Swiss-Prot record:
Listed name of the protein: Nucleoside diphosphate kinase
Record organism: Desulfovibrio desulfuricans (strain ATCC 27774 / DSM 6949 / MB)
Subcellular location(s) per record: Cytoplasm
HAMAP family listed in its UniProt record: NDP_kinase
Biological role: Major role in the synthesis of nucleoside triphosphates other than ATP. The ATP gamma phosphate is transferred to the NDP beta phosphate via a ping-pong mechanism, using a phosphorylated active-site intermediate.
Length: 139
């Protein structure tokens, strides 16, 4: 089934100039980049995006990190885009990620793990809408 999903290239990967390699891996996997923007989140924007984690002990650290430098937000489209992007990312903890996945290759820690991806279609819809309006997405 054709799906859209949302990805963020996180501050650690952007600062290490890995954006091009990660975008190339997205396309090489057969997913189509239909929207893209680079921005520097404020702490409040990061908190709004990660509001689902507000009560978790790592929330402040996560929002500090996600607002520490530029990120690249991407909308991906393709057959089964959500699970395909999650498989390409690998496990959240880079130490546990399968070899060859983006987090195994580029992740530095549980938090600085290079990339974010939506965990379900419903989450993807919220996350895409948080950063993009319909005019910014071109199939």
């Amino acid at each position: 089934m054709m799906q859209s999903t949302f990805a963020i290239i996180k501050p650690d990967a952007v600062s290490r100039q890995l954006t091009g390699e990660i975008l190339a891996a997205m396309e090489a996997s057969g997913l189509k980049i239909v929207a893209l923007k680079r921005l520097h989140l404020s702490k409040a924007q990061a908190a709004g995006f990660y509001a689902v984690h507000r009560e978790r002990p790592f929330f402040d650290s996560l929002t500090d990190y996600m607002s520490s430098g530029p990120v690249v937000c991407v909308v991906l489209r393709g057959e089964d885009a959500v699970p395909r992007w999650r498989a390409l990312m690998g496990a959240t903890n880079p130490a546990q990620a399968e070899p060859g996945t983006l987090r195994a290759r580029y992740g530095q820690s549980l938090e600085a793990n290079a990339v974010h991806g939506s965990d379900a279609q419903e989450t993807a819809a919220f996350e895409i809408g948080y950063f993009f309006n319909g005019l910014e997405i071109s199939e």
